[in-house]
Amino acid sequence: MEEEKNWIAVPTWRIPCRLERWHSLIKYLKYRTKDLQQVSYVPHHKVGWAWWTCSRVIFPLKEGAHLEVQGYWNLTPERGFLSSYAVRLTWYERSFYTDVTPDVADRLLHGSYFSSFTANEVRRAIRGEKILSHCNYPSAHTGQVPSLQFLALRVVQEGKDGSQGESTTRKQRRRNSRRGIRMARDNIRTSQQSSSQSLAQGTYFPGLAEVLGILA
């Protein structure tokens, strides 16, 4: 008697293209800037028996938890979708795990990676002093109700005063965002661009949905 085939269904997020940009950005932040030095990057040839997995990126979080981004390829081959790619976002701690959405994954990552405003910045802003810290992961605050202090610091950081337009800091951070994506897309081919210039005020991370190109 032929054994019945068992299926395992997991939630995934469809992406429109391959994952080279994601892999390049992770390797850049892990090996070049050291922002993700503790992150484990597992390429497809080291994954093992899971042939449909093209990569695994494991982010250690606080209190022994982890966030894992698994990249899938060759999905649903029985329908001919041989070029389909997707990612799965999983949070787990010990024996418990659950799948999360990109916005939740961003908030989990921001709790352990990429700098944000410190507690002393509000007092510095009130005294008219220069803001010394910046939020390098603004997409992690999407969907949250921001505090008045956070909104005030964002206004100071981005230079929105209603008359002078964009400040130098805001323009620089927009350049940093574009530069980070461009460096990932180019696979860090040019050593001068990727090693001789450092990202101002820490490394800016645009968020999982933007880097991966997750389709809604």
UniProtKB/Swiss-Prot annotation:
The keyword Hydrolase does not apply. It comes from the Viruses. GO terms for biological process: viral life cycle. Residues 159-181 are annotated as: Disordered. It is a peripheral membrane protein. A motif (BC-box-like motif) lies at residues 147-156. It is found in: Host cytoplasm; Host cell membrane; Virion. Residues 154-168 are annotated as: Multimerization. It holds the Pfam family Vif. One of its GO terms (cellular component) is membrane. Transmembrane segments: none annotated. Highly phosphorylated on serine and threonine residues. Polyubiquitinated and degraded by the proteasome in the presence of APOBEC3G. Coiled coil: none annotated. A motif (HCCH motif) lies at residues 110-141. Its main location: host cell. Keywords: AIDS, Host cell membrane, Host cytoplasm, Host membrane, Host-virus interaction, Membrane, Phosphoprotein, Ubl conjugation, Ubl conjugation pathway, Virion. Residues 170-181 have a biased composition (Basic residues). Belongs to the primate lentivirus group Vif protein family. The BC-like-box motif mediates the interaction with elongin BC complex. Homomultimer; in vitro and presumably in vivo. Interacts with viral Pr55Gag precursor and human APOBEC3G. The interaction between Vif and APOBEC3G is species-specific, which may play a role in restricting the replication of HIV to humans. Forms an E3 ligase complex by interacting with human CUL5 and elongin BC complex (ELOB and ELOC). Counteracts the innate antiviral activity of APOBEC3G. Forms a complex with host APOBEC3G thus preventing the entry of this lethally hypermutating enzyme into progeny virions. Functions as an adapter molecule, recruiting APOBEC3G to the ubiquitin-proteasome machinery. Targets APOBEC3G for degradation through the assembly with elongin BC complex, CUL5 and RBX1. Binds viral RNA and affects the stability of viral nucleoprotein core. May play a role in viral morphology. Required for replication in 'nonpermissive' cells, including primary T-cells, macrophages and certain T-cell lines, but is dispensable for replication in 'permissive' cell lines, such as 293T cells. In nonpermissive cells, Vif-defective viruses can produce virions, but they fail to complete reverse transcription and cannot successfully infect new cells. Vif-defective viruses show catastrophic failure in reverse transcription due to APOBEC-induced mutations that initiate a DNA base repair pathway and compromise the structural integrity of the ssDNA. In the absence of Vif, the virion is morphologically abnormal. This is Virion infectivity factor. The gene is vif.
